[in-house]
Regions:
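Active-site-proximal loop/helix segment associated with metal-binding centers of metalloenzymes
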Residues: 1-57, 61-69, 76
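Binuclear metal-ion centers of metallo-dependent hydrolases, dominated by the metallo-beta-lactamase
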Residues: 63-151
């Protein structure tokens, strides 16, 4: 998401009788001077906007630690976790990632939450992948059909 503008404090706008044409200037960082010459700074006339939400995904890829800087601080990272660590050699051969590698990248990038998916069919019980990832990055979820997450 793009950063949003701050929210106008309607009670202050009404109390100070600020005309509508001045609202956009105030949202953009300006203040207001009353007819009596009293200046009200921007911070008194607005409340901060919610920070923008962010989502990133890494799928069909090997472990790329250099991505950490690009992914830094995202709210939700989807990362493939095709293999368990026991199959790390197979992951490298096929240019895929392990659950631990996905979690390591999430930790390096200081993301808020990690969603792992793109599992190999060899795992009937994907909880082994979840446990491996959570051992490194606790806030990890398994992707499931129909899963809905609020950011």
């Amino acid at each position: 998401e793009k950063p949003a503008l701050p929210h106008i404090k309607r009670d202050m706008i009404d109390f100070l009788e600020i005309p509508h044409f001045a609202i956009n200037d105030i949202k953009a960082g300006g203040g207001w001077t009353t007819a009596d010459g009293v200046f009200y700074p921007h911070e008194r006339l607005v409340t901060p906007a919610e920070p923008p939400r962010s989502y990133a995904y890494c799928s069909d890829t090997r472990f790329v630690p250099e991505l950490a800087e690009t992914l830094r601080g995202v709210d939700l990272l989807f990362h493939e976790a095709t293999f368990a660590e026991a199959d790390a050699a197979r992951a490298a051969e096929t240019m895929h990632s392990t659950a631990q590698q996905a979690a390591t990248l999430a930790k390096m990038a200081e993301v808020r939450r990690l969603l792992i998916g793109h599992f190999s069919a060899r795992y009937e019980d994907e909880s082994v992948l979840l446990k491996e990832a959570q051992s490194i990055f606790a806030d990890t979820l398994l992707a499931r059909e129909g899963l809905s997450l609020a950011l």
